[in-house]
Amino acid sequence: MTNLMDHTQQIVPFIRSLLMPTTGPASIPDDTLEKHTLRSETSTYNLTVGDTGSGLIVFFPGFPGSVVGAHYTLQSSGSYQFDQMLLTAQNLPVSYNYCRLVSRSLTVRSSTLPGGVYALNGTINAVTFQGSLSELTDYSYNGLMSATANINDKIGNVLVGEGVTVLSLPTSYDLSYVRLGDPIPAAGLDPKLMATCDSSDRPRVYTVTAADEYQFSSQLIPSGVKTTLFTANIDALTSLSVGGELIFSQVTIHSIEVDVTIYFIGFDGTEVTVKAVATDFGLTTGTNNLVPFNLGGPTSEITQPITSMKLEVVTYKRGGTAGDPISWTVSGTLAVTVHGGNYPGALRPVTLVAYERVAAGSVVTVAGVSNFELIPNPELAKNLVTEYGRFDPGAMNYTKLILSERDRLGIKTVWPTREYTDFREYFMEVADLNSPLKIAGAFGFKDIIRAIRKIAVPVVSTLFPPAAPLAHANREGVDYLLGDEAQAASGTARGASGKARAASGRIRQLTLAADKGYEVVANMFQVPQNPIVDGILASPGILRGAHNLDCVSKEGATLFPVVITTLEDELTPKALNSKMFAVIEGAREDLQPPSQRGSFIRTLSGHRVYGYAPDGVLPLETGRDYTVVPIDDVWDDSIMLSQDPIPPIVGNSGNLAIAYMDVFRPKVPIHVAMTGALNASEIESVSFRSTKLATAHRLGMKLAGPGDYDINTGPNWATFIKRFPHNPRGWDRLPYLNLPYLPPTAGRQFHLALAASEFKETPELEDAVRAMDAAANADPLFRSALQVFMWLEENGIVTDMANFALSDPNAHRMKNFLANAPQAGSKSQRAKYGTAGYGVEARGPTPEEAQRAKDARISKKMETMGIYFATPEWVALNGHRGPSPGQLKYWQNTREIPEPNEDYPDYVHAEKSRLASEEQILRAATSIYGAPGQAEPPQAFIDEVARVYETNHGRVPNQEQMKDLLLTAMEMKHRNPRRAPPKPKPKPNAPSQRPPGRLGRWIRTVSDEDLE
């Protein structure tokens, strides 16, 4: 198929930027003419998950400024605590004065884990609420999911690792530029003072009033006690002002003073900013005391989203003491003006992304891009080139019509990130006015987008003088579609104003209007030469870069695929592919490629069908001549003809399309390809349906034929579906499957063992088929070979197997593959096919069945560990999870079945307590007090050792405790009278006794007694 996509795209940049903000900014094609610059600003934040593992991210997808959203963490008390604001990378008010938001997308996901955590847990729930933040009252999971009934504005239970994407879609058009609250020159002021210019466009005003004759009466209020007079929910992100008056009357005590304060409160209940209305204001008895006020709050003071306000008063007696009784009555009004707060998208809608059950300390990443139209300040304008936006009402109308049907077109505000990535190709088709809408056709959106294109493009032709001839030629269609809304009294199309009324029109009746075939290409209108020939529209220039290609209207044409083969011999196909053909009424050889011209076949009624091989007579009776032409592509209402050197076709695949064309003569575009053989007025199936179905899907069409047909998806289908994400089972039934009023000779049936209806039937081929049938009946091996061939053909892998055979002439690779192929009933095959059997895909379990199986697996595992209370029913009540550590500790200590979803933190973090035995304590005391053989330790020392064991919950003493015990033992030994006596110490200076001398063996030693 000829690929002209690079030369034929007509992109609408605005809608492309809306649906895919990462492609960059684009000027809004309305009639707001201000010189501006386009800029993309990124936002990247790594948010730390709190202790509870839950939090809330509030996005303002349409806010025209640096504010993107805010992050709140859920506290254990159940309330939210403000963490930080989410802004663009650059602070826009520093360099720019005005801005308009073009598009914005943000992604929330987590891919990091804190220390000690080895699994990425947690889910994300997201909802776009068509209201303000203060109007939400329930922030739980059920509360968020019930905030809207639109299925395209909420998603739930998305894994935190996959993430969600928030897409900003406009809620209004024709919006003016918004002042950013930028600093302005302040001549003559102190340099420390800061003057800013905030937006005053489209203010949101909150007025707090009481019913008639209502007065707030304070009877004997103690002095110094705060009294709340007014409370109200408000929403503010930008500068605000508050004004009003209070009237104090019936003051019965002299020297009364009052303090009046206004508090602006954030989403988490904390005070964002406080304004003092009056301080030490004296009240006079016997009169009405008026307290007027008018205060302002700049954007810089609003550090988090404001959702409510309250007014409080404190009265006290001058010179008195706290607690003195005071009596007064007050009435009044209050008005809060949020500047720019009523700008569409500034405060509503809001998108809330809640994450839960994420590991504490994990990081949730928020990343995205915001595209703006910006008007720089005078300093930056000196070095920055600005340009006017391109006024394109056709693109604006197309964008409005697409987004007005976004629910039917599957365009959401919140997406699972993976799904949003898959839809990018579909968004590119929506943004390209010349795309054939193949992916949209697979999703079922093609008819809606085609109708929108028809109504959006003709409006443009009424805007420019060069389009006058086409406007007159197309007047019937425009008047039918738009009626009185096509032109205003001035003669200018209402679409030029860009107002919402340009998006009106009878879209659902659009398909009934006659398409004149004129196309608009880059605001250049081309009238084809001799566009109407024999009732067939032939336009030589529908697309840029395709002016030399012939195009015809699908109105009055039927389509059918033909399998084309190249043969080494008459029975062995070498290559197999398919080509789409169209049947056109009349003799139109000028539209055929040169290889087909001059070739025709006659029908039973004598008419000609050009493009067929002249082989006998076509078994049909027709009332006129027809031409069969090959085609390369199919667009909304036109088909592009092919000039490839394709030979004349043979076979009976086109007979059904010719008969359908001759009998019914359709006058509406046919958006389906036909295939089937005629046999005695009955339509029968033909072969190679897998190949033909793939050809139809490549052109974004369905294939219709006799009966339902189920496709065996093989490797070819896996590759094809990866490139073209369509449903491979798109086999439709024709509205008329039986043509009873065709003559009995209108068709014939081919009985070919090869099931190749496109092979030319010759006597030699018929003899070969008969011989093959006889051989199959006589030889079971040959019959098996025919069955293998039919299996290859039915699954569309004949060409793949032929190419594989060329690369494996000795079949070594095939033998190894078959030897190592999985066997039926093996573990891998049971895991893949279940109990359905080898080669039969088992039905996957439903979510409920999968959950029950998971509960049973967890329960069985717990039973093997001796945890018998974790039955499948208990696991289901516990959130389909096994027992937590707290539940296990509770069961081990109490032997009672823990409550599901109860964590029992006291049992998880409690200190382990075990008592040491008396023998263990005595042995330790003896070892510490002295060596074996010494005196037993006293009872006081044994008690000291026991106290150490008790302090350590049964554990042995640590080093410090051991030192203390040794010192205690030494002290006790010195003062203990029952201690063992010390060993005598030798005298260091005493002389040793002289040993007797040796006198001989026979001489006795003379003693002192002998001397006496």
From Swiss-Prot:
InterPro entries xrefs: Birna_VP2 (IPR002662), Birna_VP3 (IPR002663), Birna_VP3_dom1 (IPR043048), Birna_VP3_dom2 (IPR043049), Birna_VP4_Prtase_dom (IPR025775), Viral_coat (IPR029053)
Outcome of swapping residue 515 to S: Partial loss of polyprotein processing
Biased composition, class Basic residues, residue ranges: 975-986
Post-translational modifications reported in the UniProt record: Specific enzymatic cleavages yield mature proteins. The capsid assembly seems to be regulated by polyprotein processing. The protease VP4 cleaves itself off the polyprotein, thus releasing pre-VP2 and VP3 within the infected cell. During capsid assembly, the C-terminus of pre-VP2 is further processed by VP4, giving rise to VP2, the external capsid protein and three small peptides that all stay closely associated with the capsid.
Annotated consequence of substituting residue 653 to P: Almost complete loss of polyprotein processing
PROSITE patterns: BIRNAVIRUS_VP4_PRO (PS51548)
Keyword Coiled coil: no
Annotated site (Cleavage): 442-443, 488-489, 495-496, 502-503, 513-514, 755-756
List of residues binding a divalent metal cation: 30
One GO term (biological process): proteolysis
Domain (Peptidase S50): residue spans on this chain: 514-755
Keywords, comma-separated and alphabetical: Capsid protein, Host cytoplasm, Hydrolase, Metal-binding, Protease, Serine protease, T=13 icosahedral capsid protein, Virion
GO cellular component, one term: host cell cytoplasm
Enzyme Commission designation: 3.4.21.-
Region Interaction with VP1 protein, annotated ranges: 1003-1012
One protein family per Pfam: Birna_VP3
One MF annotation (Gene Ontology) recorded for this entry: serine-type peptidase activity
Membrane-crossing segments per the record: none
Annotated segments matching region Disordered: 972-1012
Stated role: Capsid protein VP2 self assembles to form an icosahedral capsid with a T=13 symmetry, about 70 nm in diameter, and consisting of 260 VP2 trimers. The capsid encapsulates the genomic dsRNA. VP2 is also involved in attachment and entry into the host cell by interacting with host ITGA4/ITGB1. The precursor of VP2 plays an important role in capsid assembly. First, pre-VP2 and VP2 oligomers assemble to form a procapsid. Then, the pre-VP2 intermediates may be processed into VP2 proteins by proteolytic cleavage mediated by VP4 to obtain the mature virion. The final capsid is composed of pentamers and hexamers but VP2 has a natural tendency to assemble into all-pentameric structures. Therefore pre-VP2 may be required to allow formation of the hexameric structures.
Name of the featured protein: Structural polyprotein
The species this protein was found in: Avian infectious bursal disease virus (strain OH) (IBDV)
